[in-house]
Swiss-Prot record:
Family affiliation: Belongs to the TACO1 family.
GO-annotated cellular components: cytosol
Keyword annotations from UniProtKB, A to Z: Cytoplasm, DNA-binding, Transcription, Transcription regulation
Protein name: Probable transcriptional regulatory protein EUBREC_1961
Disulfide bonds: none
Gene Ontology molecular function, alphabetical: DNA binding
Length: 242
């Protein structure tokens, strides 16, 4: 993913080493369980599940692991009951941060998220205090090294399938879709044999904040690192232009 890309930087992601990949698989496993319980085990009839499966594949989760996760969620009435929880708040200099969690203990999660903000000189706000600064969009990132298709052909393939935008970055192509068109665009690219580095519905900031003060940069890094280390945290979105 391009280090200079705004889209690539909207979410603070863990490095994909072996330990981090294990955490990512655990997080996706929780998402699969919640999606199946909410809408059933068939991705064709469960849009949320289809999104999670796409995310799992983009993170190289083996198909048999995905299938086992779906079957377990569909047939195991004694599995852990995870609930969704979303927190919004402010980092240094008014940076906006959204934290999405899946948890079996909302009190624990709320305390941990609040602690992360506090340690980075930030603050938790009320629901909706920063989400209006973001747009929900489908986002597909393709590494140029993994793509044999010409950029123009790839762009036409994506736009014909319903994509809103196509960006040619330093070392990646980035495709943006409306949430409702995401699955169709992803499926069209998959059918064309395109390998995707990531594919998910995400939150894209409408504007970005540049931090110049070293203390602010240290503090927002502390917030994001603490949130990354929390197993209950699934996604973190922010408008800091790293």
């Amino acid at each position: 993913m391009s280090g200079h890309s705004k889209f690539a930087n909207i979410k603070h992601k863990k490095e994909k080493n072996d330990a981090a990949k294990g955490k990512i698989f655990t997080m996706i496993g929780r998402e699969l369980a919640v999606a199946v319980k909410e809408g059933g085990p068939d991705p064709a009839n469960n849009f949320k599940l289809a999104q999670v499966v796409a995310k799992a594949k983009a993170n190289n989760m083996p198909n048999d692991t995905i299938e086992r996760g779906i079957k377990k969620a569909a047939g195991d009435g004694n599995s852990v009951n995870y609930e969704t929880a979303t927190y919004e708040g402010y980092g240094p200099s008014g940076t906006a941060i959204i934290v999405k969690c899946l948890t079996d203990n909302k009190n624990r999660t709320a305390a941990n998220v609040r602690n992360a903000f506090t340690k980075g000189q930030g603050s938790i706000g009320t629901q909706g205090c920063v989400s209006y600064m973001f747009d929900e969009k489908g986002q597909i990132i393709i590494d140029k090294e993994e793509c044999d298709m010409d950029a123009d052909d790839l762009m036409m393939q994506a736009l014909d399938a319903g994509a809103e935008d196509f960006a040619d970055e330093d070392d990646s192509y980035e495709i943006t879709t409306a949430p409702a068109d995401f699955d169709a665009v992803r499926a069209a690219l998959e059918e064309a044999g395109i390998t995707m580095a990531s594919a998910e519905v995400t939150m894209i900031p409408q504007t970005y904040v540049t931090l110049t003060d070293e203390a602010d940069i240290t503090n927002i890094g502390r917030i994001l690192d603490l949130l990354d280390d929390d197993d209950d945290v699934q996604e973190v979105y922010h408008n800091w232009e790293e």
